[in-house]
Amino acid sequence: MEKVNAFLKRKNIVFSAKRYGIDALGAMAQGLFCSLLIGTILNTLGSQFHIGFLTAQIGEKVPYTIGGLTSFMSGPAMAIAIGYALQAPPLVLFSLAAVGYACNLLGGAGGPLAVLFVAIIAAECGKAVSKETKIDILVTPIVTTLIGVGTAYVIAPPIGTAASAFGLSLIHI
């Protein structure tokens, strides 16, 4: 048990309510604010004040507005913010972008909640393997991404279903 504790300490993996419930959740809120909420604000400003560049569609294959693009990146922004709060090394941090995107895509209404759980799991697993091999530049992103996207595939849809059911139950009160 001493070896496990020493390894976790060396990797800065701390299992605590403060780390996950306050630090990670607070960072997630910042990621959400800097993406979804700012995107909504930009869209509203563009619509209400007829600011063309804020309402103009950009992109040919998938047309978005600036605010729409910003909102669309809420999953990656939240996951990266969570990784930052957990003091994840750079290769883990950058790999969390795909993890956050997968959570939001697969989680529907529960995407943000799925991001919280999955990003914590993926970040801690990525931290555990980081700098343990000579091919760290491959191992760390692969482990972080596969664990994160795999976990998202398993738990994000049920979280989304539960979030939708909860939302519908509130409507019918």
PLM feature spans:
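Conserved small/polar residues in nucleotide/adenosyl-binding loops
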Residues: 171-173
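Short, membrane-interfacial amphipathic segments enriched in basic
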Residues: 2-17, 155-163
